[in-house]
Amino acid sequence: MKQIRSGQSFLYRTNGYDSTVVEIRMRDKVTGSYLQVALTNAARRFPYLTQKLVEKGGAYYLHRDDNSIVAVKTDKFRTLGSMATGYHLLDVTYTGNCIRVAFHHGLCDGRGVMPFIEAILYDYCCQKYHKKFSSEGIRLPGEPIPEEETAEPFSREFYEVDEQAVQPVEHDGFALPESTSTPDACYHSEILLDEDTFVHAAKAAGATPTLLAAMLLSRCVLELNPQAEKPVVCNLAMDLRSAIGKELTHRNCVGTAYLPYTAEDMKTAPEELARLAQSRRPSWR
């Protein structure tokens, strides 16, 4: 068993923590039998993603789970780590032309689960379309698993931090009047953007696509809520693998950047806002 250090913050919560779901929309209807074979093969290559949680003395550990991982046809999200998922901390479901992979951040983060998803899609498409696609960049069953893939990014020792260099972070932001903690009252909308055009616009402003999206969304919130007296604080997820020298690990390496956006910022050119945001990086958590 391996004790969980990274990802601990997602385990000790009063009401648990919602899983994160990656939805893949295929062009054609999903064939369950092909998906199951692809999932079984991917589980052989990524055994560390099929583990279960074990609590011992108030600490949580990852332990081998011999239950088969099964792709289920349903549009419901099943509780991870429960009997319904064979106690696994990830779950693969499908309906229509959609494949959904749900995972718990105590096990891994988005970048950590992506090679697993890519392996499933590669295997599935080879079966579905009776074609051998290029496997470049795909981690296949039978390949050796580097130790770096399962490395724990956090040690028991604290990193040295120059407290004087750490800038204060704004947490107290404007909340939308319709915001609610009741899941049944939540909804989501989708916006389709031309990728090349958006990336070009971000580069022209000296920003990353994520940073530009955050600024645009924050601006929209303030334009629709001119009465807001507090800044809109956008939380941006950050991959800290490069910073800690653990590029290959699947474990949780997510940090958070807090980007405040005020009514005064609406008068500032995007290029200047991007420069200011980049300069605040040392204060990001």
What function would you assign to each model-found segment?
Residues 1-57, 67-91, 222-285:
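Acyl-thioester-dependent acyl-group transfer interface
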Residues 2-3, 107-115, 119-200:
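Non-catalytic, low-complexity flexible loops and terminal extensions
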Residues 19-21, 96-98, 186:
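Short, solvent-exposed beta-strand edge segments and adjacent coil->beta transition regions
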Residues 27-43, 102-118, 187-226:
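Acyl activation and transfer enzymes in specialized metabolism, enriched
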Residues 59-60, 99:
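Hydrophobic residues embedded in beta-strands of well-ordered beta-sheets
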Residues 63-68, 103-107:
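Secondary-structure transition/turn motif
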Residues 90-95, 166-168:
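A short acidic-Thr-Gly-centered motif at the start of a beta-strand
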Residues 96-108, 258-260:
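Short acidic, glycine/Ser/Thr-rich loop/turn "cap" segments at secondary-structure junctions
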